[in-house]
């Protein structure tokens, strides 16, 4: 079973994404801020990160930069930030996709599956303690 880490602080979106992804047989891990995410990465197998930009203790752009520097885990931004400069920044930081809220369920699932097809799960696995 593939694991998706959702980094989101909005409870309504968390519940909706969890329901949608679990229905598609994904294991869902929830982190509500940057600190929780930093602690979760490297402690469990994660195949994909769905990342918001506006977080209570930091921003998703900086978190994406960190994730890309230390792991090979693919990132999809899922955010209300719809300015062209934000989309370009997210993709320039290495995100595999950028989806603007509100989103369509089928489109989100299709984009998630397309990203996962491009990544071999063994390549995305990081071992506890491997991040310096």
Protein language model annotation of sequence segments:
Residues 1-119:
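N-terminal/domain-start alpha-helical segments
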Residues 114-132:
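Short, Lys/Arg-enriched segments at the junction into DNA-binding effector domains
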């Amino acid at each position: 079973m593939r694991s998706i880490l959702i980094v989101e602080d909005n409870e309504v979106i968390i519940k909706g994404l969890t329901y949608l992804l679990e229905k598609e047989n994904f294991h869902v891990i929830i982190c509500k801020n940057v600190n929780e995410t930093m602690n979760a990465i490297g402690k469990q197998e994660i195949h994909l990160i769905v990342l918001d930009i506006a977080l209570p203790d930091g921003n998703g752009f900086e978190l994406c930069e960190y994730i890309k520097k230390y792991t090979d885990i693919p990132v999809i931004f899922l955010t209300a930030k719809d300015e062209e400069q934000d989309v370009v920044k997210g993709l320039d930081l290495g995100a595999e996709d950028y989806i603007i809220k509100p989103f369509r369920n089928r489109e989100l699932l299709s984009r998630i599956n397309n990203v996962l097809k491009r990544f071999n799960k063994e390549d995305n696995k990081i071992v506890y303690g491997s991040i310096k």
